[in-house]
Amino acid sequence: MQAEIIAVGTEILLGQITNTNSTYIARGLAELGIDSYYQTVVGDNRQRLSTVIEIAAQRNDLVILTGGLGPTKDDLTKQTLAHYLNVALVEDQAAMQKITAWFATNDKVMTANNRLQALYPAGAQPLTNHNGMAVGAFYQSENSADFLLLPGPPRELAVMFDSEAKPKLAAAYGEQAQIYSRVMRFYGISESELATRLQPLIDEQQAVTIAPYAKTNEVTLRLSAQAMTETAARGMIDKVDHQIKATVGPYFYGYGDDNSLVTTVINQMIAAKLSITAAESLTAGLFQSTIGSVSGVSAIFPGGFVTYANEAKHQLVNVPQAIIDAEGVVSEATAKAMASGAKQQLNTDVGISFTGVAGPGTLGGQPAGTVWIGLAYRDRPVKAKQYHFAGNRQQIRERSVMAGLDLLRHALNEDTDLKK
């Protein structure tokens, strides 16, 4: 079973609005086990719309059109489809009553063109618009593709698709193989390196699709499998998931489209009841701001320090002036002293520090992008790690924060490993 989604609207082609409708529909089709290999966007032009309808009908079992069902002159979708099907437009009485009632209730004059919103192609099943006026339709054909008409406004489309269209599609096409996907998230490895290391696994896969995607400062893998039940698809993906972790496990930190490294790390710390503070120089509070975005962080984060100037490092977190004079502010010794000093000042379980050169110039002979991150973790020896980041000033600061979170992640995982 194969479907194509056609989004109608010149405003989409001009980039004036984002086409979220096609994304929403595609996800719903995947849940129903209906494949979708094409998505088309076409402007409000009868001839071009007619052409894309004809092309879509030739290569698909189902064609879904969204947009162009309203009362204005550029709303041409249902008229164009009716012409293609060689059927008339008929009125849905329930929709018409709703339209007239709305104008009467709001004491407004109803113009004749509003009646267009109650029309749908003859022979189709009308679909109620619970959040608007334009009626949708599901047309089943014996000799051609089937058609689904949905409104353009996203809040109207979502409700109609979920409550009206999906049940009809399920009833019409019966049980289809379901597509199940899982997103794996990685930090500390590039997309190219991840793909290279997993290439033998990717090449041998037939039942599970492995697709890498580069995100800001991280990489994700989307694993997809198709089976008659979600349980069967999960089983297929579980096997590949295990093989991926066996190959690049140290870089893996979590699952999900909406997950993030900071959410994963802070939730682990909350669960472990480990308190944290930070002393920040080049990041100037960005680490604390980042962890502050996670709900519930107040349970483990009493506060922290922005120690941009050398005097602040000495006064706020007790970094000995002798260390700064001897080793320099961008050094392993200074990073360690900042982390342990912050931890002692607020009596937390963990102290983390950031000192480095955000750029664009050098500092103490150190080039831009040189960063030391210190970590005082529970009763373990204080350590620090050096990094060299590329990018502009803001990118270096953001990458420093991500590296600090990853340093914390590894420390937390060491705790977990020791308990096993």
Curated annotation (Swiss-Prot):
Annotated CDD domains: cinA
Pfam families referenced in this protein's UniProt entry, alphabetically: CinA, CinA_KH, MoCF_biosynth
UniProt xrefs under InterPro entries: CinA, CinA-like_C, CinA_C, CinA_KH, Competence-induced_CinA, MoaB/Mog-like_dom_sf, MoaB/Mog_dom
Superkingdom to which the source organism belongs: Bacteria
Entry similarity comment: Belongs to the CinA family.
NCBIfam families (alphabetical): cinA_nterm (TIGR00200), molyb_syn (TIGR00177), PncC_domain (TIGR00199), PRK00549.1 (NF001813)
Entry protein name: Putative competence-damage inducible protein
Organism: Lactiplantibacillus plantarum (strain ATCC BAA-793 / NCIMB 8826 / WCFS1)
